[in-house]
Amino acid sequence: MFSYPSSHELSERGIMSETPTNRAIPDAATQVDIYRRMIRIERNDDLTRQQIRRGRITAPYYSARGQECIPSAISVLLNNDDKICTIYRGIHDMVAKDMPLRPLWAEICGRVDGTCKGKGGPMHLTHPETGVMVTTGIVGSSMPIANGFGWAALLDGTKQVTVAYFGDGASNIGAFHEALNLASVWKLPVIFVCQNNGFSEHTRYENGTSVDFIAKRAAGYGMPGYTVDGNDPLDVYAHAHAAIERARAGEGPTLLECKTFRFMGHVFGDNDAYMTKEEKAAAIEADPLPRFRQKLIDDGVASAEQLDELTAKIEAEVNDAIDYAMACEFPSDDELRRDVFAEEIPA
């Protein structure tokens, strides 16, 4: 059995956090890999916004700048056989899972070489080869879908786990409660990860959620629930490690609430006046990227030169994917009728 303490500890930021017994600490190579994934998200996010400003992309974009730590510290623990189900603000989850950037960008740009032949766009991406199973624009729907993959893993007798990513607003959707209940009853190997950035679209957390910590809701469904510092890679890693090991051992699901903050509005270009200047300043101060970079340097895990070289390599990877996507063709008119019905509809 994997043991979890029953008491809550308060971190320096007042975040409720429970530490799993035998807290896992990533080795040096794993810490650098977490940072690599974080930088991959940040560079991809920044260059996406640049392309939108230049008018080269016209699709809606939901930035996750500030939330890089969460999927990076989780994905480093997953195999390609392990699956993720995410939401419209989920490109960072896919990038952290090491989804190839060329087909990702081709899909974002609506090109035929995209993961969904240009029909899905940035809100409906998939790449089963790396375990990216579904991106959904329906709030809360990633969780029951994840249960389906968890049930399949049980039937197949594998050790696969599925991670369901969602936001704090989705914790108030009926699908959240139904999914957690079923996952607990059937002991599904699913980890429910709430990326709590404090806002449900434009609504403050406290104006739409009845509990101070979403993780408390896990108790009602007989599963462990933990609120962790979503800006601390080592905290996320330790809790995700325990949750994943528990799931692989057949002991069922875990709810992880990762407290964080998104630097931008709900959708790129919207008015974020509902965020105060003080909140934005505090978020930038708590930016996980420079903090973790400095920690790696201070601890002797990597040098500044090594991390700069890694960043340059990743930026080149993103730029290559952009150039590739822009050179791809748009889908033909005939493609509109494909992948819609079981039998192809004649023109």
Over which residues does each language-model region extend?
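Conserved acidic/glycine
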Residues: 2-70, 258, 268-273, 277-347
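A broad, low-specificity signal marking well-ordered, structured residues that form hydrophobic/aromatic
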Residues: 7, 123, 254
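N-proximal short alpha-helices
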Residues: 21, 115-119, 256, 265
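Cofactor-binding active-site loop characterized by glycine-rich and histidine/acidic residues
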Residues: 46, 50, 54-186, 204-210, ...
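Glycine-rich ThDP/TPP pyrophosphate-binding loop and its adjacent helix/strand module
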Residues: 132-327
